[in-house]
């Protein structure tokens, strides 16, 4: 059975959301790169592997029941204390285009359920992410 590291699982979450609407935009790709390079959770991740990990996720998503398989790998790899981080990363990628597609909303909700994040906690994370992306 395939397994992934917690770093890969977090990257999978971002790739899954970016690919949800069928188009991985330049803003989404740029955001993934910036987040991986700057967040403390990725401090000991070899950033030269980012493209390879993203491609691995894409391959999993292409399989039958790919979304379920990818999210299963994510859920198995993430310790409980990183599930909220994963959810926030999903929101960051969805918001990076300044618009959130319906497909992305569905995938984010699926991620929330798969990671066992309570609705109230999810709402707080969502509000924080939305506030971060507000413009005047």
Where are these regions (language model features)?
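Small-residue-enriched hydrophobic alpha-helices in membranes
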Residues: 1-136
């Amino acid at each position: 059975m395939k397994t992934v590291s917690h770093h890969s699982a977090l990257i999978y979450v971002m790739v899954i959301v970016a690919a949800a609407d069928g188009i991985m935009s330049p803003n989404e790709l740029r955001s993934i790169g910036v987040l991986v390079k700057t967040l403390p959770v990725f401090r000991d991740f070899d950033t030269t592997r980012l493209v390879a990990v993203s491609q691995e996720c894409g391959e999993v998503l292409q399989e039958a029941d790919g979304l379920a398989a990818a999210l299963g790998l994510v859920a198995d790899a993430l310790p409980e204390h990183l599930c909220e981080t994963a959810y926030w990363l999903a929101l960051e990628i969805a918001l990076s285009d300044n618009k959130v597609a319906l497909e992305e909303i569905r995938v984010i909700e699926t991620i929330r359920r798969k990671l066992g994040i309570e609705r109230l906690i999810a709402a707080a994370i969502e509000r924080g992410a939305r506030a971060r992306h507000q413009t005047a």
